[in-house]
């Protein structure tokens, strides 16, 4: 499996904003440059980590690819000595998309024994998490430990919770203080930044990465290569359009494209959220690049090269179309590139192989740009009512949960007890029936987790393909304005930032139902009201006070 976060891929494309209503509750401001530096934990590489088969490749802007592993360690080494807990009793809430494990199951019991605490896991429905948590915060009844996904900061008003209902971890983890916890100290600095509000550290990152790319334009590598088409032949938008013509055969029910707008627009250098020109904020909707990208996608939608179901807005069956070869090119989050995808694809077509095009520029000239998304989007927090000794106990537990890939602790957290929850099949930890029922990736790892790695035991080619593509593209990563910055925005402006009326028209345009001029009209209406207010607020409250975070 890939331990890169497979949830919230699109969330990586947004600033880590929180929203507040019109009340007078305390709200955390953004971070100052000096305050952020003081709050962040020191970074110390983990000497207990298992050596990867494919080493990370460094890029610019603090970017680096995730390490790759082609097999699971036969004898997982320990990264923690002794038992971290001291017998405390706590509750924890994490979002769960799926069936909740039985209460008090054997995996929970094994974890509590290893952790030295009585940690009662209370996974909550992930689909309704955005409404479940505000009910808790309104009653001021948060659990001792909770996961608050950053893409829901606006729903939760996280900026209003830090320091009031959520504990300040700065005294325990900032600077060299984190060195007491080697597994936590090895997490990327950018990931810790997602949990800093108002120059204080509150959050513990899960599934962190220095390769925070929201997604890519994927293609059926097996099909295209059989037609003599390789990824390095695609250097411009025209190249893609020409391939679309070559691959589409409507009579056989094959179309070249599914939806590609979300992750392809950067080929025109459309900004992620904002651009700064001569000290002034410019929204993507205001740029010529946005209109040029949209024009190309409108022409694609009306070319006959896009699958009719995609044009009709059918997202749910996109993977099925891709696996069956009915559509051959489509955008998606990087979490799709994993062993499960390979297994589903091979079940539909034994020759199935996923590939991704390298970053391109629309005109085939110059250097491509890939805007970095957040280094972590799953963040956990501790309750402000906890005593210092309790906070220290749970941080020690978090250090255990953050044990690197392939260690003894990682194996227990992710696979349970060998012989009970998993057995080794060809060297790969494989769940038993009890393990399938009890061990959930969205429970303990949503409280703390190691940095992401790429590993697909039994699907080594997937790991090789993914890491090869990552290595070829990491040099294009760059941080957009306000990268990793947390700030509290009025609810009305958070809605303005989402621009639902524009995005509805935009979607109709890249599906060929409305013209570019219709989108321009929607943008003009948005700019004249909420758009201008949003820009002014961002200028006055973030850019002028704290800079762009770069």
Give residue ranges: language-model regions.
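Helix-loop-helix "hinge/cap" segment bordering the ligand-binding cleft or interdomain interface
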Residues: 196-263, 276-317, 321, 382-392, ...
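Short, well-ordered beta-strand elements
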Residues: 85-98, 117-122, 145, 202, ...
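Hinge/lid segment of periplasmic solute-binding proteins
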Residues: 45-47, 51-73, 155-214, 264-266, ...
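Extracytoplasmic/periplasmic substrate-binding proteins
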Residues: 262-272, 298-301, 305-441
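Bacterial lipoprotein signal-peptidase II cleavage site
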Residues: 20-29
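N-terminal export signals
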Residues: 1-20, 329
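Extracytoplasmic "Venus flytrap"/periplasmic binding protein-like
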Residues: 113-190, 196, 222-228, 232, ...
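Conserved small-residue motifs centered on glycine
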Residues: 60, 66, 71-78, 396-508, ...
